[in-house]
Amino acid sequence: MLEDICSQHKKLESQKDIEIILVDNNSFDNTAEVVYRFVENTELSIKYFTEKKLGLSACRNFAVTKASGDLLAFIHDDINLDEDWLKEAYQLALGCHDQEIGVFGGRSVPMWQEDFPDWLNLQRPYGVRQEVFNGHSFGDEEKYYPFDTEYGTAEFPSGLNVFIRKEIFENCGNFRTDLGPSAAGGFSMLDDYEFFEYLSMLKIPMVYVPQCIVYHPVSPSKMTIQNIRRWYFKHGRAQYWVAHTDRMKRDPHPLLGINPKFRKIIPTFAKQKFKGVPIFLHLKFFFLTVEWLIQHFSLNSARRHWLSFKISETMGEIEASALVNEQVNSRKFSFRDRLIKKGITADFN
């Protein structure tokens, strides 16, 4: 990737005001040796740092403190750049868009290293979400985030390929370090989604820029049923956690996966909890499982697989809801203990 950036940099009419920041997340290989060897043979401004706190979010936040530019580009180390990526990124930095826009979300296209399995379906209505394969491709036209997708979800930029003005971090905060790959909190995704959804709540303009393209390799191991189920489980787990904690905490019992238009008709009892888990999630798991069993007698394998993925996602939500309930109870008893120490008593039941 460094070679690609160096090659594209030489083609720019102006080669100033570009720096590369590499953050080594406490690796034990020869990463530092490779980087220093590359730095000696290029005119690019490359800064190399080590962040001991594990997690992609921690690395991003650390990189922000070391960056001197006004527009920061974030990409992963396992992607391939489109031949015009740096040129298009430089156009963003030059201010070819409204200066009020705080975030530009680029396109990420999966690079399939093997033909699709016969069972794998990417099309509606029972298609696997492209995010499973690190895809973020929504047409050739620029448009403002968030926008609705074919999956019925609100879409935000992907951390695989995104450009953020540095002042955003100064004014709005950083990525949550309990989310994302290798995060201490154990929630290995939605670190970028949570951050951009939060910016959307703050009315920060964000635009999808499809001309800034990266390609993400997809190995055969990523295209297995087990891996996709694992992805949906982690997604459901992180989705519920994000909705109930920290700066994104909303309705204490959101009906995740249900269109807001229909949430009002859900019976009140379904929003209550049974053993720390909303009854709605118990019901959701039950009915999905029943339908999945029925589909075993059907020839519609795409729907059967889709149902198994949704069951995995619901199981993740159930696990996260139990963790949230545990956290709430812990805070409740901690508050009670503080009152008791002060000689104040109350009925907490």
Q: Which residues fall in each region the model found?
A:
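Short aromatic/hydrophobic "clamp" motif used to bind/position activated sugar donors
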Residues: 72
